[in-house]
Amino acid sequence: MTSTIANYRVSHSFSPSTSYSLDFTLPSKSISMKNHTTTKTKIHSALLTLPKQNNTPKNQPQFQTSHWNFFQKAAAKALDIVESALVSRELQNPLPKTADPRVQIAGNFAPVPEQSVRHNLPVTGTIPDCINGVYVRNGANPLFEPVAGHHLFDGDGMVHAVTVENGSVSYSCRFTETERLVQERELGHPVFPKAIGELHGHSGIARLLLFYARGVFGLVDHSHGTGVANAGLVFFNNRLLAMSEDDVPYHVQVLPSGDLQTVGRYNFDDQLKSTMIAHPKIDPVSGELFALSYDVVQKPYLKSFKFSPDGEKSPDVEIPLDVPTMMHDFAITENYVVIPDQQVVFKLQEMIKGGSPVIYDKNKKSRFGILPKNAENSENIIWVESAETFCFHLWNAWEEPETDEVIVIGSCMTPPDSIFNECNENLKSVLSEIRLNLKTGESTRRQLLSPSDQVNLEAGMVNRNKLGRKTQFAYLAIAEPWPKVSGFAKVDLSTGEIKKHIYGDKRYGGEPLFLPRNVNSEKEDDGYILAFCHDEKTWKSELQIVNAMTLELEATVKLPSRVPYGFHGTFISSKDLQNQV
């Protein structure tokens, strides 16, 4: 098959085993893509010339194809033939936009190869003296070109790291060496099902059966997890953890050189027996880490737990849910864990009917569970309904004892399932204040921005030193034109006043990270915003450092390679780096 793609003349190795020649003609933006192995394929993404992916696994897989016996080789060949037939049949019908790689990984959503550390990067302006350490950001970066359905969230995890040491800056990016990635790299093609892009309808069931058949013959090993570790990052107990809610975290080290290295799956010394949500919360006062784990197959569908500052896990608290709920984020207050039980749920039986297992259940009532942090069971959880509320992310929550309320700040998204399922209605993400009355069981919700100021706000944070306590400001990505991010906003949560930092014409970024000047700053907004920015005209990327009080640009770091639009990040101080395990 041939394809029309845009923008540059390059050679690109999408996977270690397949080389593609891309012929770009400017300004017509037409590309002919030829596969020099045995198949032809297409992808509508602007791919950039970068070094080839390393063919040599950093971590030796527990199995090797060279050790397969005759029956395994025969089974592998037969199952590959079955999969090829399945893909051919699947591609006879148009893919929905939410599963079409030509949409999901187009332009600067397209993957990049790994980049070894590059030092002494050019800086414009002056980097504040208080910034010493490493800014790390996670994202989805598929190692192999998709052969069928693919959602942005399905990509392999890649961490981008910008290290600042006394004004000198270095950059690197590396795959997180998940069990999934290591096995697929050894096999030379993707075999693990993609949770969103592929697991829908009858073809999704067939893919699951194929995957388990490969497991029966010892061609893959899913006993050590299937996660992609592409969403969240947290530095806890002297470890940088890369996370996605489909697995336990992965421990990633920042090397003294500024490069990155995967240590491996981290289950907190065998204490964590289940998956863990990608947005754990660290209480800035106690130092405890709070987390959730959900299961889409069997009860309990949801569990809550915490870790002490030195990594000791509490017993699980089982949260009673009637159906498994999609729960990407949650919140904490000084005394409570705030659990959103919303209307986007998992119904695997929908696949039998030919549909998606992730659905918007209009008959379900959205609610929040308020669980005491030290609860040993769910007996004292308080449920408060909040009609038609779906927040993909919650930015903060706090208690107001004088009114018996918990205040939740989040971006309410409509249509609720638009990230996962194709919708005709335009997506809206409205910054909202939700007040949950623990005494009456009632709730209210209001938009924080005036109608004239309304913009989509998604991805961001408050000052993490104030997490779980009342905050005045939130720093959030301006998700327009969706799904791109044209800048970020500083919102006064008490007045609704909004100030914006816009990247400029054809320049887009991602999540803004707020970095306090120091932990003892008197003013909540005394610090800096760090954010990647990509220029789609020049195809160059940079790191911007913006004064959080004035929103004036303090410095930019020119990066040696393209940084795709990604997900969430954190900052590790130079002091914490020295204490890494």
From Swiss-Prot:
GO molecular function, one term: carotenoid dioxygenase activity
Induction (UniProt): Induced by abscisic-acid (ABA) and dehydration.
Cofactor: binding details: Binds 1 Fe(2+) ion per subunit.
Protein name: 9-cis-epoxycarotenoid dioxygenase NCED2, chloroplastic
Lineage: Eukaryota, Viridiplantae, Streptophyta, Embryophyta, Tracheophyta
Cofactors named for this entry: Fe(2+)
Transit peptide, residue positions per record: 1-82
GO process annotations (BP): abscisic acid biosynthetic process; carotene catabolic process; response to abscisic acid; response to water deprivation
Binding site for Fe cation: H279, H328, H393, H568
InterPro entries membership: Carotenoid_Oase
Gene Ontology annotations for the cellular component aspect, listed alphabetically: chloroplast stroma
Tissue specificity note: Expressed in flowers. Expressed in developing and ripening fruits.
Keyword Cytoplasm appears in the UniProt entry: no
Primary subcellular site in the record, as a coarse category: plastid
The protein's Enzyme Commission number: 1.13.11.51
Family: Belongs to the carotenoid oxygenase family.
Transit peptide listed as a keyword: yes
Taxonomic source organism: Solanum lycopersicum
Function recorded in the entry: Has a 11,12(11',12') 9-cis epoxycarotenoid cleavage activity. Catalyzes the first step of abscisic-acid (ABA) biosynthesis from carotenoids.
Keywords: Abscisic acid biosynthesis, Chloroplast, Dioxygenase, Iron, Metal-binding, Oxidoreductase, Plastid, Transit peptide
Catalytic activities: a 9-cis-epoxycarotenoid + O2 = a 12'-apo-carotenal + 2-cis,4-trans-xanthoxin; 9-cis-violaxanthin + O2 = (3S,5R,6S)-5,6-epoxy-3-hydroxy-5,6-dihydro-12'-apo-beta-caroten-12'-al + 2-cis,4-trans-xanthoxin; 9'-cis-neoxanthin + O2 = (3S,5R,6R)-3,5-dihydroxy-6,7-didehydro-5,6-dihydro-12'-apo-beta-caroten-12'-al + 2-cis,4-trans-xanthoxin
Subcellular localization(s) per the UniProt record: Plastid, Chloroplast stroma
Protein's pathway: Plant hormone biosynthesis; abscisate biosynthesis
